[in-house]
């Protein structure tokens, strides 16, 4: 375990826009990295990634490790898991954090399998054990009736996905800067088992429920759709 060092945050982005949960993870990652006296790195995967690193530095990253490749233009489990696993095997981070998003839940378990380590999903709390230095990963269990704290005692890296709006980002500081490490990976495209067809973004004027600060809902007592007007009022 002594050869593993540093904390990584997978910097999920789509079309150059970083997911809000990444800023939250960088805030928690900054706190943990300061406790462990280690570097906090953000890992970027995709294509045409220019300008994204500056955003990650502003929210606490010391360095950004990225693979900018046409093969990563569209998200696909096998390519993203191969790329992140390759980087982790090379740099050997002690901790890898990712958002418990559709993307994170889809490919991060593959990375854990590739690296022969454990993964705690949907965490709501992350702390460092002051005696062992292990990452204590807390998540709801048994239908949310209890909170379980899990450690990956014998394997590295320690991996966790974290729910949106659980951690707090640090205050953005555009004067912060860091190092960008440009990496490459030779994708065996002919071995792909899936094909990208298209991505159609839903057009709506409604607020994304995951970004809402307050959610008001109605049950069967409403009886008729028109009665939702009372809730809207």
What do these predicted regions represent?
Residues 1-233:
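N-terminal glycine-rich FAD/FM-binding segment characteristic of electron-transfer flavoproteins
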